[in-house]
């Protein structure tokens, strides 16, 4: 028959607690890392929304205005100036 002393039992319980705490701490770090990645992706989306999209809109609108202005306004000919 196997004799288990209190010291052996406490050692096994301590090892289990250390293993559980290690898993919990690892889980906390993994969740924090994933949350950081998600936050970075959201910030990149905001960067796109607030910086790139307005500049693309201004560029496209400027091109539209330039084309419409250059099509509508034709420089006068030399006959008109005489």
From Swiss-Prot:
Similarity annotation: Belongs to the betacoronaviruses E protein family.
Main location class: host cell
Alphabetical UniProt keywords: Apoptosis, Host Golgi apparatus, Host membrane, Membrane, Transmembrane, Transmembrane helix
Highest taxon, organism lineage: Viruses
Subcellular location, record wording: Host Golgi apparatus membrane
Function according to Swiss-Prot or TrEMBL: Plays a central role in virus morphogenesis and assembly. Acts as a viroporin and self-assembles in host membranes forming pentameric protein-lipid pores that allow ion transport. Also plays a role in the induction of apoptosis.
Topological domains, Virion surface: 1-16
Membrane topology designation: Single-pass type III membrane protein
PROSITE patterns recorded: COV_E
Subunit structure: Homopentamer. Interacts with membrane protein M in the budding compartment of the host cell, which is located between endoplasmic reticulum and the Golgi complex. Interacts with Nucleoprotein.
GO CC terms of this entry: host cell Golgi membrane; membrane
Biological process according to GO: disruption of cellular anatomical structure in another organism; viral budding from Golgi membrane
Stretches of the chain found on the membrane's Intravirion side: 38-79
InterPro entries the record matches: E_protein_bCoV, E_protein_CoV
Record-annotated membrane-spanning stretches: 17-37
Name this polypeptide is given: Envelope small membrane protein
Note: Isolate N1 belongs to genotype A.
């Amino acid at each position: 028959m196997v004799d288990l002393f209190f010291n052996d039992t406490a050692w096994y319980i301590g090892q289990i607690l250390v293993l559980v705490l290690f898993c919990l701490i690892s889980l906390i770090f993994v969740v924090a890392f994933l949350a950081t990645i998600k936050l970075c992706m959201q910030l990149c989306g905001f960067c796109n929304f607030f910086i790139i999209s307005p500049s693309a809109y201004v560029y496209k609108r400027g091109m539209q205005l330039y084309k419409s202005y250059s099509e509508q306004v034709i420089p006068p000919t030399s006959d008109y100036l005489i």
